[in-house]
């Protein structure tokens, strides 16, 4: 069994924020693969289904970003899911818009959602880093992540979430490099990434 966690903030006010791209990704996984209706539990919302041969629980913590770890710990504990079987989908400032990287363990790069999760379950979970780009200076970061994607961004955001959902079974299977490459090729096919980009860490 796998636990896929999308990070974001709850409520319509935040729904299209850059910080919420993790929510957007798991919403698309649920939609594309016919997962169960979302239900409220574990200080969040869950949906259940299968990706390939793996049973997968999707989780969107509704604790607000900075306390996401409480929800993740509760869900992982209930289902007896080890940190190595937890995958977190989150926004990544240090990657250009639309680029994806997958890593297991490591630092949190200043991401408060990851900080909370690491404090509750340790560092040994998988992260799917969804590039949103950096505003250029540190002082603008807070406003950048908590503002909505521009209309001009809608096409690449939709393409990215669609590609992540289409190839999500590869993450469930543990073939991270193949997943990242397939997502990269899907983005490249729509003209959103250049040929020298790749999805490897």
From Swiss-Prot:
The first-level EC class reads hydrolase
Location relative to the cell? Cytoplasm
Q: Where does tRNA bind?
A: 14, 64, 66, 112
> What are the alphabetically sorted keywords of the record?
Cytoplasm, Hydrolase, RNA-binding, tRNA-binding
Q: Where is the active site?
A: 19
Q: Where is the signal peptide?
A: none
An annotated Gene Ontology molecular function: peptidyl-tRNA hydrolase activity
Recorded GO CC terms: cytoplasm
Catalytic activity line of the entry: an N-acyl-L-alpha-aminoacyl-tRNA + H2O = an N-acyl-L-amino acid + a tRNA + H(+)
Q: Where is this site: Stabilizes the basic form of H active site to accept a proton?
A: 91
**Pfam families (UniProt xref):** Pept_tRNA_hydro (PF01195)
Gene3D superfamilies the UniProt entry points to: Peptidyl-tRNA hydrolase
Q: Where does the record place the site Discriminates between blocked and unblocked aminoacyl-tRNA? A: 9
Q: Choose any GO biological process term that the UniProt entry carries and state it.
A: protein quality control for misfolded or incompletely synthesized proteins
Q: Chief localization class? A: cytoplasm
**EC number annotated for this UniProt entry:** 3.1.1.29
HAMAP family reported in the protein's UniProt record: Pept_tRNA_hydro_bact (MF_00083)
As for what it does, the entry says:
Hydrolyzes ribosome-free peptidyl-tRNAs (with 1 or more amino acids incorporated), which drop off the ribosome during protein synthesis, or as a result of ribosome stalling.
Note the subunit structure.
Monomer.
What family is it from? Belongs to the PTH family.
- Please state what the protein is called: Peptidyl-tRNA hydrolase
Protein's organism: Bradyrhizobium diazoefficiens (strain JCM 10833 / BCRC 13528 / IAM 13628 / NBRC 14792 / USDA 110)
The lineage, from the top, is: Bacteria, Pseudomonadati, Pseudomonadota, Alphaproteobacteria, Hyphomicrobiales
Per the record, the gene is: pth
